[in-house]
């Protein structure tokens, strides 16, 4: 069994907020187990996000498309109860405007925009990853409200949204991330 060090970063706040993915894999390997394909896919997605330092708002807009993102931002204007009612009555609120073509085009446009912006500048990735705490709790609450219909429910909870609709959405999202990762490695 390998020893795993508890080495924590004491750098800037942006570095502290990052998930130490290599450490997670080392811990798993030291326990003699491997990550499931789904867990490995999630780690790849987080690694991609950390590498590109894409703010969560832009990620949501890219993944959900303009219609889904507008629906998500519309939650900020309504009360939490009203937002939950609105979400529970919609079969799959973010499927509007979400096609593999939209996601690919939106992500590619963002990557192109980021590449053009950074080619003329000599800035570090750390500078691009600044945290904006003032909107954090509002965004966190909206994200919880938006995703709550898709999370596992208590046995006595009757939800109108079938769990079977979440799997194709996640598979589509994972395939888009894979596409981008493979494209990035080819460059």
Curated annotation (Swiss-Prot):
* Protein origin, superkingdom: Eukaryota
- This chain's protein is named Putative uncharacterized protein C10orf88-like
Source organism? Homo sapiens
